[in-house]
Design a protein with these regions (language model features):
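Charge-enriched amphipathic alpha-helical scaffolds
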Residues: 278-312
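Short, conserved secondary-structure transition motifs
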Residues: 171-194
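C-terminal engagement modules used by replication, chromatin/transcription, nuclear envelope/ESCRT
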Residues: 301-371
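Short capping segments at the starts of secondary-structure elements
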Residues: 262-272
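A short acidic, leucine-rich amphipathic alpha-helix
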Residues: 272-278
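A conserved mid-domain beta-alpha-beta active-site/ligand-binding segment of alpha/beta enzyme cores
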Residues: 187-264
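A structured, charge-rich N-terminal accessory region that forms the first stable segment of a protein
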Residues: 32-116
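Long, hydrophobic/aromatic-enriched structural stretches that serve as scaffold segments
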Residues: 111-162
Length: 371
């Protein structure tokens, strides 16, 4: 049985991403993750980056909650959002942008996050804002330390690095807390701390984004084997992504195993299980709608790993969840979830499909293993 990090005692706080999608389920009160050390960059904030009334700024951040706080903070400039759930579903790097957005919109619609047309419109709007970066004096990227944000960051930097920006300055704020939690005053105080994006950061982001979208996940391991210090939170995020590959020991992703472990420890309600699994994360990145999708997969098989009452698609606050005998066997490493049900899962550019997974995560070795 693969090891999990111990659960922490956390303070409850609202962590609504408000991604711009119409989630099918109500949001719950979530828990905050522990704070990681603030990143340090070699390039100090120079005087020409300090905002002046006549400078045109574009702020790009991870969701409507953070965007609203930036607007309330009084900082000058326009605000845009980029908030795709890149840690879920197909993200093949070989597709041109228009086709890529359609693939993403189809996944988001099929998963119940939004209807296809609305999702496609949002994805297109977010990209168009980045593509217009050259019309601003400065573009400020506001992102957090978790997997959700780090994937958004490397995609944004990859897109921006491919544009002719002229004299536009790119700067970056990497928060060690969740931006949606911050007060407008604290958000305004972060702006002078922003750092100019250098060539090392652009180069690393492009390499990492292309590795994420590759059908060969060993390219991610190659990125991790190199110097990731220009983006201090990227290493942890990419490792967390690799942990979503089915494990050698039991065929479970880390997220799936955390759910079974929470149930084994006595959690029963949706909220209890959700909060328990958030407590097992070093950096929280998954919302309740995404979590609900995993529950549906664990329950939707003739030999399910969990049972739910009154039903997995019922009201979330009414759900009661329990481990099945098969779930206990898989959690104990006595059976294998992939071999029970097969697999059809996209992780970035990797499509795991069939009765066996082509790639698995070996937690003991800290690396991928061919299936």
């Amino acid at each position: 049985m693969a090891d999990l990090p111990p659960a922490r005692s956390l303070t409850a706080a609202e962590l609504m991403r408000q991604l711009g999608f119409k989630f099918p389920a109500p949001a719950l009160e979530l828990a905050t993750a522990s704070r990681a050390p603030a990143p340090r960059f070699d390039t100090p904030l120079s005087r020409e980056l300090r905002p002046a009334p006549e400078r045109r700024l574009l702020h790009v951040t991870n969701g409507d909650s953070a965007a609203g706080t930036i607007r309330l903070s009084g900082v000058s400039g326009e605000v845009s959002v980029t908030a795709d759930l890149l840690h879920e579903g197909p993200a093949p790097g070989s597709l041109p942008p228009e086709r890529w957005r359609k693939v993403r919109a189809r996944y988001l619609a099929e998963s119940g996050y939004d209807d296809y047309e609305s999702a496609l419109a949002a994805l297109t709007r977010w990209d168009r804002a980045l593509e217009a970066a050259h019309s601003y004096d400065e573009v400020v990227l506001w992102f957090e330390h978790d997997l959700f944000d780090q994937l958004l960051l490397i995609r944004a930097l990859d897109l921006l690095a491919g544009l002719d920006l002229g004299g536009t300055v790119l700067s970056l704020i990497q928060a060690d807390d969740y931006l949606g939690h911050l007060s407008p005053a604290r958000m305004a105080a972060l702006l002078p701390e922003r750092q100019r994006v250098g060539e090392d950061q652009k180069r690393l982001a492009r390499e990492a984004w292309r590795a994420f979208g590759s059908p060969d996940p060993r390219r991610i391991e190659a990125v991790l084997a190199g110097d990731t210090s220009p983006l201090p939170y990227l290493e942890g995020a990419l490792l967390r992504h690799l942990e979503e590959f089915p494990a050698v020991a039991d065929g479970l992703s880390r997220s799936e195993r955390q759910i079974l472990r929470a149930l084994d420890r006595g959690a029963v309600s949706f909220e209890e299980v959700f909060r328990a699994t958030q407590g097992m994360e070093e950096r929280i990145y998954r919302g309740d709608a995404s979590f609900h999708r995993i529950l549906r997969e664990l329950a939707a098989h003739p030999r399910p790993l969990i049972r739910t009452e009154p039903g997995v698609n019922g009201p979330l606050r009414a759900l009661r969840i329990s481990l099945t005998p098969t779930g206990r066997e898989v959690l104990a490493g006595q059976d294998d979830w992939v071999r029970i049900r097969g697999i059809d899962r996209w992780l970035g550019g990797v499509h795991l499909q069939g009765p066996e997974a082509a790639w698995r995560w070996d937690a003991a070795a800290g690396r991928l293993a061919a299936g």
